[in-house]
Every structure is written in structure tokens, then in C-alpha cells.
């Protein structure tokens, strides 16, 4: 999930781009060669502070340049954010490589600011190793425009001790799986009756509530926006399906009474609540155990399972991060950029990858992180790196494998569950507007989901979608 909010990119982007160009005196081409004739690969997000991160990347730069004499890596301190992105892109001043998110990549591809990587990916043997579901996110019309480096899908994290107390664990050590959102609500009721604590926690603030609400609404049959034949986007979540999904959130508070008393829950508070036994279940991805280790929740007390289905479909949100390569990059720069990225995120189990990966899981186990969750990967089973990662997870597993089996099985075989990326435009603004709707139904017993969504839909259209020009 991106942390940067999309701003209007019409007159602002154009005027800012002109200003940048005038101030810099630069043209619209990425500088290609250094004084020694080496092809320059500028890399965005380069660390500025002295420390381990900078030392590691400088060492990687040295190794890369030693092995690839015709390339030179140049660090660029600019870190991706949409407020400055479109100005830099329009001025031709993007670094060759820049990091972005699933949320933004479709916009960037549509705007033409990322290079076509398809042929070079195939040439370097990368194309056939990318997870096909992830490949869809970074593709347009059968061509690939970004290099994925991380992926995740949501499931449900649960407190094993609470599930055992409530009689919700099976004899084989796996949990009972709520197959629908309504079943999850019933589980939450039983958990609260048993433990006296909230059975479920749901975020409501800093865009997190809207973010997680979208996948619930999708499962009720709702959509949030549609692109017309004229290329313009239309908000469409003033629908009975979206209202039904928001009613489910409302019912968690007023019908089932299974939520914490606190109704302002951001990302940090969400995992703090779960990690301190303030709730028995939370929507989470494979990295959830790492978010709660500081709250001293023991590995054997943490479990993961699949996402429930809604009345219309079974769907989970897939997110992640990608590296894009500037549309101004030369063919030689694209070649070098992908070679560099393979050092950062390789599909192959190189000796360096094996050493680093084993060390990482060993350290996690020693620090009390749950090791055992096999998260979604950007690579498929053709990747030796993915196979080795899973071997190390099995080797250093420090909890009962049965507690996370349902999630691991879900990641490996979705069994008919639809993977859906985040909304294609103005996702962060949408999440913020939906946060307001969620907070209202949780603080006002008389709030009407349909009325709230009518206004939210109108505001989203007027304030954001109508201002897009790409």
C-alpha cells in the first residue's frame, strides 16, 4: 500500500514540470554515458544517511560495476512520491530506476512514464519466472512495464490461544476456517463470549480502513470505479452492494458488539491491538507476524488462514511493490537496470541469496518472529529462489505449522479465489473517503450506509476523478 497521496496532476504537473526544466536547464533525455563511456544507471531512493543500509548498497554497487564494466551505478536521492513524480516525469528527469507501488503502477503505465521491459526480461530469462498474477499488474496489452519486487495477499491472522479456548481449533492443529464474512462475525461473537475481549479488530484511520474495506465490498459484488469509452473514470460505489458491505461493518459494532471501543484505529494501532490480545482476529498479510513481535506475542500463539468469501464472490486484495524504468531510458540502460535489479531481487538461488536468506530467517527465529508463513511471492515455482526461501522457512519454523497451514495452502493454491489489485486511480483518496464512512457507521448507530456512500461517491467523483487528465 502506498503512503503517498495522489494530487491533481493537470495544470500543477505541467507548470511544475516547466519550472523544473527552466531551473535545471536540462533537456528531456536521461544522461546515458559517463566520461569513461560507461552506461549510467541512476537508481532512485538511494540512502542518504550513513549506516548499514548505505554500506550494503555501496558494496553491491562495487560488486556490480566490477562484474559489469560497461555500466556505472549513480545513486539518486529522490524517493518516489506522487506529489513530485509527474513533474519530474514530464521534465524527463526521472532516475533510470525508481520504486513505486501496485496502487500507482497502472497510472504510470497509462501515462507513458515507464519503459517497455518485455524483450529484455525475456532475454535475461526473467519473464517466465514472474508470478502470472503479478505479471498482470505490471502489464498492458501483453507488454510488461515494471519489475515486481514484492507481493502480498490478505488472509486472516488469529490468536491461537483464543481459538483453542473457544473450541475453534481442529484436532489436527488447524483452525476452523470462517468461509464467509458472516461466519467470521459469528466466530468473533463466540470468541468474545469465551475470552471477554473483542473478537475482531478493523482499521478506520489513515486510509487503512478504506483500503481493507475495498476487498470486502468486492466480495459483496461492489465496484468502485469504471472507465468509460471516452477514457474518463466514473465512481460507482453508490450501489446496494457497497452499502451491504458497509452495513456488515456497522453490524460488527451495533449488532454483534465484537469490536474494540476505540474507533480510531490506524495501521500501528491495528497490530498493537491484535498483538496485545486486544482482539482475537485481524485481516492481515504474510508480514503480520513481523508487525506484532514487539508486543511479545509468542510464535505459537499466532496463526494465519484464508480470507473469507462474500455473498457474491471470493476475492482478496493483492498488493506489492515494483521498480519501474524511466521511459527515457535507452535500450542499454534497460539492459543494465534489469541486471542491477537482479542483484537486489533475484529469482535465482545464488550463493549470496542463499547466505542472506538463511541468515535472515535464522535471525527472525532468534528474535521471536513467527517463522512459518509462506507469503505470496512475485516469482513462480520456476524460481529457485522461491524454492530455497520455502526450504528455509521449513528449516527455521518456530511455531506449529498447522497454525498457518490454511494460509500457506491458500497462497499456493487459491482454489477459485480471485486476486484483485488495488483500485487503478486515486486509490489513496478513495481510502480516505471510505475511512470517513467507516468511522461514521461505528460511532453513529443511526448512520445509513446508503446515504453515506451516495455522498462519498459524489465527493470522490467531483474532487478527484473529474480532475484526472490521464
Name what the model sees in each region.
Residues 183-190, 230-263, 293, 303, ...:
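Glycine-centered hinge/linker elements that transmit conformational signals in sensory
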Residues 2-111, 122-126, 332, 348, ...:
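Conserved N-terminal structural module of periplasmic/extracytoplasmic solute-binding proteins
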Residues 115-130, 173-177, 200, 222-244, ...:
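Short, solvent-exposed loop/beta-turn-alpha elements that line the ligand-binding surface or hinge
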Residues 101-155, 164, 179-187, 212, ...:
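Hinge/lid segment of periplasmic solute-binding proteins
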Residues 76-85, 103, 179-183, 261-275:
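Short helix-initiation/N-cap motifs at beta->coil->alpha
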Residues 140-149, 154, 164, 182-234, ...:
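Extracytoplasmic/periplasmic solute-binding protein
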Residues 288-298, 312-317, 324-432:
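C-terminal lobe and pocket-closing loops
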Residues 71, 89-100, 113-115, 197-198, ...:
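Alpha-to-beta junction loops
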Amino acid at each position: 500500500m502506498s503512503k503517498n497521496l495522489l494530487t491533481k496532476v493537470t495544470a500543477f504537473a505541467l507548470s511544475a514540470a516547466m519550472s523544473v526544466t527552466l531551473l535545471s536547464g536540462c533537456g528531456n533525455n536521461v544522461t546515458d554515458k559517463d566520461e569513461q563511456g560507461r552506461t549510467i544507471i541512476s537508481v532512485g531512493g538511494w540512502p542518504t544517511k550513513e549506516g548499514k543500509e548505505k554500506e550494503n548498497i555501496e558494496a553491491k554497487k562495487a560488486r556490480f560495476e566490477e562484474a559489469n564494466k560497461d555500466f556505472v551505478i549513480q545513486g539518486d536521492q529522490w524517493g518516489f512520491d506522487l506529489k513530485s513524480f509527474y513533474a519530474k516525469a514530464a521534465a524527463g528527469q526521472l532516475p533510470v530506476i525508481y520504486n513505486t507501488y501496485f496502487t500507482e503502477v497502472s497510472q504510470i503505465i497509462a501515462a507513458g512514464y515507464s519503459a517497455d521491459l518485455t524483450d529484455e526480461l525475456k532475454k535475461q530469462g526473467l519473464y517466465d519466472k514472474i508470478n502470472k498474477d503479478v505479471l498482470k499488474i505490471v502489464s498492458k496489452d501483453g507488454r510488461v512495464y515494471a519489475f515486481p519486487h514484492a507481493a502480498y495477499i490478505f488472509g486472516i491472522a488469529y490468536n491461537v490461544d483464543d481459538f483453542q479456548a473457544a473450541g475453534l481449533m481442529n484436532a489436527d492443529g488447524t483452525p476452523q476456517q470462517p468461509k464467509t464474512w458472516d461466519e467470521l462475525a459469528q466466530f468473533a461473537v463466540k470468541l468474545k463470549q469465551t475470552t471477554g475481549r473483542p473478537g475482531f479488530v478493523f482499521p478506520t484511520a489513515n486510509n487503512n480502513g478504506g483500503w481493507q474495506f475495498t476487498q470486502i465490498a468486492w466480495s459483496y459484488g461492489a465496484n468502485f470505479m469504471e472507465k468509460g469509452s471516452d477514457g474518463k473514470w466514473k465512481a460507482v460505489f453508490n450501489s446496494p452492494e457497497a452499502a451491504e458491505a458497509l452495513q456488515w461493518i456497522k453490524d460488527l459494532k451495533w449488532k454483534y458488539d465484537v469490536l474494540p471501543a476505540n474507533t480510531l484505529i490506524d495501521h500501528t494501532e491495528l497490530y498493537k491491538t491484535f498483538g496485545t490480545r486486544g482482539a482475537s482476529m485481524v485481516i492481515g498479510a504474510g508480514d503480520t507476524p513481523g508487525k506484532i513481535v514487539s508486543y511479545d506475542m509468542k510464535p505459537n500463539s499466532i496463526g494465519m488462514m484464508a480470507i473469507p468469501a462474500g455473498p457474491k464472490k471470493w476475492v482478496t486484495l493483492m498488493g506489492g511493490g515494483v521498480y519501474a524504468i524511466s521511459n527515457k531510458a535507452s535500450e542499454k540502460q534497460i539492459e543494465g537496470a534489469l541486471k542491477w535489479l537482479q542483484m537486489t531481487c533475484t529469482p535465482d538461488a545464488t550463493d549470496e541469496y542463499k547466505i542472506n536468506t538463511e541468515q535472515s530467517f535464522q535471525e527472525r527465529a532468534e528474535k521471536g518472529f513467527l517463522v512459518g508463513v509462506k507469503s505470496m511471492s512475485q516469482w513462480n515455482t520456476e524460481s529457485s529462489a522461491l524454492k530455497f526461501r520455502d526450504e528455509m522457512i521449513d528449516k527455521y519454523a518456530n511455531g506449529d505449522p498447522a497454525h498457518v497451514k490454511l494460509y500457506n495452502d491458500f497462497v499456493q493454491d487459491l482454489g477459485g479465489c480471485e486476486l484483485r489489485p488495488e483500485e487503478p486511480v486515486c486509490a489513496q483518496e478513495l481510502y480516505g473517503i471510505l475511512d470517513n464512512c467507516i468511522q461514521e457507521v461505528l460511532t453513529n448507530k443511526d448512520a445509513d450506509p446508503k446515504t453515506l456512500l451516495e455522498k462519498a461517491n459524489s465527493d470522490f467523483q467531483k474532487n478527484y476523478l473529474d480532475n484526472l487528465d490521464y
